[in-house]
């Protein structure tokens, strides 16, 4: 199940695990990323808690946790090469995997059509 937030994050949800990243729209708005800071594996976040930070040549921005959960994996590749977020935001540029505290909460997030309306 693919979901989106109004803060320009995407979630690919399989069971109770969500892979989280920023959308192509967010990556375009930020410009070329030069730095990514990810949370620690095992860190727990409440919905909308600051989970990661990205910096581009234009700006720094926080990435928020889209739902309550615990980080189970991070994508070290984007720390080593932040440009992956720009070149493949919904593929190789994912940020972290989150074990959802309550997977049903994802129903309250945006579907792709609603997100596309938001950014139109």
Curated annotation (Swiss-Prot):
Its cofactor is (R)-lipoate. GO terms for biological process: glycine decarboxylation via glycine cleavage system. Keywords: Lipoyl. The keyword Glycosyltransferase does not apply. Binds 1 lipoyl cofactor covalently. The modification N6-lipoyllysine is found at residue 58. Residues 17-99 form the Lipoyl-binding domain. PROSITE patterns: BIOTINYL_LIPOYL, LIPOYL. CDD domains: GCS_H. InterPro entries: 2-oxoA_DH_lipoyl-BS, Biotin_lipoyl, GCV_H, GCV_H/Fam206, GCV_H_sub, Single_hybrid_motif. NCBIfam families: gcvH, PRK01202.1. The glycine cleavage system catalyzes the degradation of glycine. The H protein shuttles the methylamine group of glycine from the P protein to the T protein. The glycine cleavage system is composed of four proteins: P, T, L and H. Belongs to the GcvH family. This is Glycine cleavage system H protein. It comes from Allorhizobium ampelinum (strain ATCC BAA-846 / DSM 112012 / S4). The lineage of its organism: Bacteria, Pseudomonadati, Pseudomonadota, Alphaproteobacteria, Hyphomicrobiales.
